[in-house]
Regions:
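Residue microenvironments linked to proteolytic maturation
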Residues: 8-18, 73-167
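Catalytic zinc-binding patch centered on the HExxH motif and its immediate surroundings
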Residues: 70
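Short conserved beta-strand and strand-loop elements enriched in small hydrophobics
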Residues: 54-63, 109
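Pocket-edge structural micro-motifs
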Residues: 22-23, 61-63, 86, 140
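Conserved short "hinge" loops at termini or chain/domain junctions
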Residues: 25, 59, 63, 77-79
Length: 179
């Protein structure tokens, strides 16, 4: 009898320095947690934390804060999960991380968080209702299967300008000379 291991491989196209990924899927039960009945994150569990911290959330490798590679530039809290976009600056570690992303070494994401409010689901699983997001990590083995790198691309002009607020009306008419 032979055992076969089938791996799902994905092709992540590298076109820039922004990593986009589903940091945590909603309503997916993980059993790679201390609770024997599992744990799942409810929709918008991180909404308050994201509102407070915004782009001051960092991306590191394997939850090692000494290997921080990127900073959040945008969040999308959709029905499937919390999607984050992180910008990698130039640097030896960041450049190597981009190469490793292209080679499939970092296919998944994981969140470090502190639960603020939890409840129990009908199946006994811990349901995280509200949590404080500490950081996000690129990992090889996620706690939640749906937490995955979705793309690596160039920053969109709108995502770079989102945090600046509305554009002010400025009169660019030349001023008359008085001398």
């Amino acid at each position: 009898m032979s055992d076969h291991l089938f791996l799902d491989t994905r092709d992540v196209t590298i076109t820039g320095r922004n990593v986009i990924g589903r940091c945590v899927p909603y309503n997916e039960t993980s059993y790679l947690v201390p609770s024997p009945k599992g744990e799942r994150i409810r929709r918008q569990a991180f909404a308050e934390s994201i509102a407070q911290r915004g782009t001051n959330v960092f991306l590191n490798l394997e939850h090692d804060e000494t290997r921080t590679v990127a900073k959040a530039v945008r969040w999308d809290d959709d029905d499937d999960g919390l999607v984050g976009e992180f910008h990698l600056r130039s640097g030896e570690l960041q450049d190597r991380t981009l190469e490793e992303l292209a080679d499939g070494w970092w296919p998944y994401m994981s969140v470090a968080f502190r639960p603020l409010r939890e409840t129990r689901g009908g199946d006994g699983a811990v349901e995280v209702v509200t949590a404080k997001l500490a950081h996000v990590a690129l990992v090889k083995c996620p706690a939640y299967d749906g937490a995955e790198v979705l793309a690596v691309r160039n920053a969109s002009p709108t995502s770079l300008l989102e945090g600046l607020g509305p554009r002010p009306d400025i009169d660019l008419t030349p001023l008359p000379r008085f001398w």
